[in-house]
């Protein structure tokens, strides 16, 4: 009997385009999920594929959606909402109507339990900070809750609770996949902008970049703590990367780079030539774009049973 396979899709705002390339590489190999768990933009991408057949054509359709997205479609400026939010009369700075329309257009099932592929969404209780796995109930509201970046979008009301972005509590919910019985987990992180020449200038860009650094650190810890409980395959996000999570202008580049990297990496995994042992927080000492690729994934030959992995030094970025 085949292993139960999960796809876990992390948050990352505009860097969610990276997951489109990764998904294409997976579906090209006919690697299909038995269940999908998503957080934030990963919930949007996950809900899209959970609505449709597990085919390359589905990913082509998702790519077309992403190519049509712009910053102002997701984060539309509204001076009045921003003013009221800044002075405490609203709990958010950006109207949610555009995001709600986007979610409604891409999720083709009304309730989570009606998805073609079992689909679960992670959100955060705005009051307690606890993480919630939403497995039943209104599907579009669940995705909207998971993507409700705190302070930017309003919380989503769900069964008497105010829910915000799942990335606050658990951006890459590997543990939930294992709890649901997954034996093989494909993890689709969006990565971080590791190759910037200077910190982001805008407030929203700085917020999203800082959150990406924070959640990456949690991911490293979670992979280390769970690696013996399931087969974890972490697809490598593009690196070096100098695209901020608020930049929708380089979607095509992100999709293509992610597809190329994921396809090559899966080839190595299929041949037993690569074992992902973890990631590292890093940046690049060279100027942006100064290297073709910095690989934060230490790759070693497969380790024989009972052996200890080598801890050889990798490239320092």
Go through the PLM ranges and name each one.
Residues 46-49, 124, 197-201, 279:
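Short secondary-structure transition/capping segments
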Residues 74-193, 225-276:
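Active-site-adjacent alpha/beta core region of enzyme catalytic domains
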Residues 1-34, 45, 49-50, 59-60, ...:
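Catalytic domains of lipid- and phosphate-ester/thioester hydrolases
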Residues 52-54, 202-206, 252-253:
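Short, hinge-like loop/turn segments at secondary-structure boundaries
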Residues 61-72, 209-223:
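Short, basic, helix/turn surface patches
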Residues 2-103, 135-145, 189, 193, ...:
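Patatin-like phospholipase
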Residues 31-33, 129, 202:
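Catalytic cores of transferase enzymes with a strong primary signal for eukaryotic protein kinases
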Residues 194-218, 228-233:
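Short acidic, glycine/proline-enriched helix-loop-strand junctions
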């Amino acid at each position: 009997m085949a292993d139960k396979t999960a796809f876990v899709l992390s948050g990352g705002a505009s860097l969610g385009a990276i997951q489109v390339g990764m998904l294409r590489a997976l579906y090209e190999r006919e690697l299909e999920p038995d269940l999908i768990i998503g957080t934030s933009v990963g919930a949007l991408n996950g809900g899209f594929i959970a609505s449709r057949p597990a085919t390359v054509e589905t990913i082509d359709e998702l790519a077309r959606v992403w190519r049509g997205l712009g910053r102002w479609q997701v984060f539309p400026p509204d001076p009045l909402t921003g003013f009221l939010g800044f002075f405490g009369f609203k709990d958010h700075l950006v109207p949610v109507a555009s995001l709600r329309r986007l979610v409604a257009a891409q999720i083709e099932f009304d309730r989570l339990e009606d998805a073609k592929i079992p689909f679960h969404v992670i959100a955060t209780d705005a009051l307690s900070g606890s993480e919630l796995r939403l497995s039943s109930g209104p599907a579009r509201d669940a995705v909207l809750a998971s993507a409700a970046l705190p302070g930017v979008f309003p919380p989503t009301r769900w069964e008497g609770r105010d829910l915000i972005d799942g990335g606050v509590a658990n951006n890459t919910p590997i543990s939930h996949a294992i709890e649901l019985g997954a034996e093989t987990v494909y993890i689709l992180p969006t990565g971080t902008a590791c190759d910037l020449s200077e910190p982001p200038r805008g407030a929203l860009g700085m917020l999203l970049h800082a959150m990406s650094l924070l959640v990456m650190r949690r991911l490293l810890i979670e992979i280390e703590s769970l690696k013996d409980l399931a087969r974890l395959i972490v697809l490598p996000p593009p690196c070096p990367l100098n695209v901020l999570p608020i930049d929708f202008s380089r979607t095509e580049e992100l999709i293509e780079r992610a597809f190329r990297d994921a396809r090559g990496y899966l080839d190595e995994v299929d041949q037993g030539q690569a074992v992902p042992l973890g990631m590292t927080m890093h940046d690049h000492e060279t100027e942006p774009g100064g290297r073709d690729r910095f690989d934060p994934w230490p790759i070693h030959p497969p380790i024989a049973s009972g052996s200890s992995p080598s801890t050889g030094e990798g490239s320092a970025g």
